[in-house]
Structure formats: C-alpha cells, structure tokens
Amino acid sequence: MTVITRFAPSPTGKLHIGNVRVALVNWLYAQKYNGNFILRIDDTDRDRSKVEYHEAIIKDLQWLGINWNSSFLQSTRFNKYAAAKQYLISSGRLYECYETPEMLEIERKRQLASGYPPIYSRKSLELTTAQKVQLQAEGYKVHYRFLIDRNKPIIWNDLIKGEIKYDGSNVSDPIVIKEDGTMIYMLCSVIDDIEYRISHIIRGEDHITNTAIQIQMFEALGAAIPQLGHLSLIKSDSGKISKRIGGFTIDYLKDQLGIEPMAVNNLLALSGTSNNVDAYFSLESLITKFDLSAFSKSTIIYNENELVTLNHKLLVNTEYDTIKHRLTAIGLPDVTKEFWLAVRHNLNTLNDIKIWWQICYLPTLDKFQEQDAEFLKLAAELLPSGKLTDNSWDDWVQNIIKATNRRGKALFMPLRLALTGITYGPELKYLLPLIGGDEVRARLLRYQ
C-alpha cells in the first residue's frame, strides 16, 4: 500500500504553529515511508475564504520546506460532491430538514434543561412529502443531515491514542449541506479522501468527534476507512492557540521574530515526543528521527523562549557560506566571514546581527563611567599600533594590567562599555579587528 497523507487548511486565516504541526507530521510520515503528500485547500466557506490567505498558506509551507506531490481546491469539485449527495440521498443516509437556527436553539436549550444531551431529535424524518411542500411554500429552506447509525458502536485503533470508542446513540446527525446548497467540510473531506486514496489521516485531537462521524460516512459511501491518528493539541501558557490570536502565526515568527524555518520544524516535529528537542539542520534529519509511536497523548505547552533557544543553536553552528545570501537579503551585503564568526554566538535571531553591525560601524555610544576616563586614556595610549588582529587583544590587556594593576571586571567592563556601549557581547578580542585601530582609539578618547 502506498502511503498517502494530506494537509487540508482552510484559507480563512493565517497558518499558525498548531496547524503547521499537523502539516509537518503528515509530510514527515509520507517521506518516512516513501509516500505522497497532498495539499488540499478547504475553501467551501465562500464568505470567509480569501485568496490572500490561500497564497499565504503556500508561501508559509514553502518557507518551511514542506512540498507536496499534488494540490487542489475543494471549490473546484462541487460536481463530485453533488454526485455523492445524490447517492447518499438515494441510500437513505441524507435527509431533508427545515428547522431554522432559532428553532434548533430552542430545542437544544429544552434538552439541556431536561438533563439530556443536545442531540438532534430527527423530527424531520417524520415529515411527509405534502408537509415538505407546505414548509417550502411558507419560505422554509431545506438543509440536509447525515443519518448516523445509532445502533452501531464506532470504534477505531488510533495511531497515537490507541483504541477509541463512540456510542452511536450519543452522536447527533450533523448538518452536511447548508440552506444555500453548500456542502460543508465534514462530508467534502470524506469524498476527497476516498478519491485521492488517502491512506492515513493525521490531525489534531479536536477532530476526534468529527472522525467518529466520518467513519460512518466512509462506510456509507462504500469505502475503506483510512488509518486514523490524532495529535495532542498545542497550547500556550495563556491557553488556546488559533489563527485569530497574535504571536503564533508563521508570518509573525518569520518576519517579526526572525526565526529560522528549521527552528520551527525542530520544535513542532519533536515536541511532545520521546525524542529530545534538538537543533537539526535539515528536514532529512527529522525524517530519520520521525516515529509516530513516539508522540505523547499529553497536551504540549508552547514556549516562545524554547523556539528562540533552538534558533540560537542553529545560528551558532551555521557557516558563513550558508548564511551569506541571507545577510544580503536583510540589507547587510558587506558582512565578512570574520564578522559572522565573531558575532554569531550572540545572535538569537538573524536580525540581531544588525545590532552588532551598528555597534561596530555605526556606533551611538553613550554609556560611560566618568571615573574611568583616565583609565581609558591610558588604554588608548597602550593600544598596539598598526593593524589589529585577534592576537592584539592579549598583548594589549597584558600591558594594561602592568600599567594599572586592574583585573577582571574592573578592567574589561570599562573597555566594553567604551567600545560597544553595552555590557555584554562577543569577545572583544574578535571585535577589535572589526572595529579597527583608529576607531578603537577614537572611542577610548571620546570621553576626554
């Protein structure tokens, strides 16, 4: 059997780390078993689906390195859905309903008040043809529900959670075709999964109830049921993650936070598994590590600091030739290999390099302790002449110690503040050659 997985986002908002994790896991599973990965755009919601969100989904997935063997939009397949609709009507699994949302809400409240679960009463099944004609004449619009077999337990062996059971009598018949004739996601998805021979459906555990219903839809359409797996959800410290809450979207991580794509991939592929979350440099490494059985059933708490730490590890170990084109893209085409090697250990994101470029070549230095003025003047006098190298620092420091008897923080901190304006950063021995002898001397003497 060929493994075929899919990712089916709705173009109603931007991708966030929760749904990207689903995409990544499905992609990794397909790659692990030499299968195919399909991108399906669930755009049947005509009011909320936007072209710009569709384009953003494509862009974000490509940025992460997730590619697909084929792609399609559900909005191009209405003829297929219409044929399935007629089949299900003729087989008695779709039936007409005429209740308004207000009527359904009254029924729901009545059931809850009586201590019953809000399960649709199936009153519409009792309507005669004449009654349906009368309702239509009175302006009531038809919608369709899928008839759940309530005498049959729904059971599947989940790839992540193990055996899951649903009592069919506790499942309400879902509306699958709206009053405007639009078929909703739940049934469209099953029709597509059948035609595209999806072998494994892996998605968030918030879809478990949908899965129970869709199992009966597969059976009603005479199709085999794919392997099913449900990932635990990702939550933030403050609660739910969604496309409508800021701070979790891929464009925020990429454009505002400055995160590398592999930092996102590492965190989402390895969090909530028995594997350590480490900084792998390629998706190929993650494919090798990938094991669906390693995924935990517990909720994952997303921590942005953990993502930034992974990002730092990646940058620290990134070679200059690999990053050079990216430096040009962010407006720093003149960064040399020496500069990159000097500052990369102090970068949490690539954009941080702009701070050190500013410090070395476009300084605005205002931090200085007045009592250190004479010390800095002496340090300037002791600075080696000629071009500074990595070795210049050690010679310079030894001469300063001999002349002032200063050591440790009392020696290094005034120099760091005078030369960089901040109390932390790359080793000064590597910054000196970058700043240059004349500029180092000028910075030391500017306080005289």
From Swiss-Prot:
One of its GO terms (biological process) is glutamyl-tRNA aminoacylation. GO terms for molecular function: ATP binding; glutamate-tRNA ligase activity; tRNA binding. It is found in: Cytoplasm. A motif ('KMSKS' region) lies at residues 240-244. Monomer. Belongs to the class-I aminoacyl-tRNA synthetase family. Glutamate--tRNA ligase type 1 subfamily. GO terms for cellular component: cytoplasm. Pfam families: Anticodon_2, tRNA-synt_1c. ATP binds at K243. The keyword RNA-binding does not apply. Keywords: Aminoacyl-tRNA synthetase, ATP-binding, Cytoplasm, Ligase, Nucleotide-binding, Protein biosynthesis. The keyword Ligase applies. A motif ('HIGH' region) lies at residues 9-19. This is Glutamate--tRNA ligase 1. Catalyzes the attachment of glutamate to tRNA(Glu) in a two-step reaction: glutamate is first activated by ATP to form Glu-AMP and then transferred to the acceptor end of tRNA(Glu).
